[in-house]
Amino acid sequence: MSDQMPFPFNNFTYFFTLFSKFFSSFHHCTCSLSVSRQYLALDGIYHPLRAAFPNNSTRRKHFTNNWDPRHTGFSPSMTSCSKEHRQGPATKLPSSNYNSDVEDARFQI
């Protein structure tokens, strides 16, 4: 054995405590979760687990019938809807040869 101990017993209280509030077998930068029946243990506080969707979510009509194609999920100031999703008449793009459509308009000096 070497003369130096790998763990200094005089500083033992700084490295280990029996209080569950302060002791964790994991590194402090990780988060340890444990699931016990209907509760989730996080930081010593038990939070009841809830389903992400209610049991009758397939019977609700607003998931499909009231869908607004103009809704992007973003704030109006952040983005606008794409042309495919806009309602109303489509805008006509100018032709590549914009002078060919005007035959009667002749300019005279």
UniProtKB/Swiss-Prot annotation:
Chief localisation class: mitochondrion
Segments of this protein annotated with the region Disordered: 62-109
Any GO BP: regulation of cellular respiration
Assigned GO CC terms: mitochondrion
Subcellular location: Mitochondrion
Role description: May be involved in mtDNA stability or mitochondrial gene expression regulation at the post-transcriptional level.
Matches recorded under PANTHER family: PROTEIN TAR1
Name this polypeptide is given: Protein TAR1
Annotated source species: Kluyveromyces lactis (strain ATCC 8585 / CBS 2359 / DSM 70799 / NBRC 1267 / NRRL Y-1140 / WM37)
Lineage, highest ranks first: Eukaryota, Fungi, Dikarya, Ascomycota, Saccharomycotina
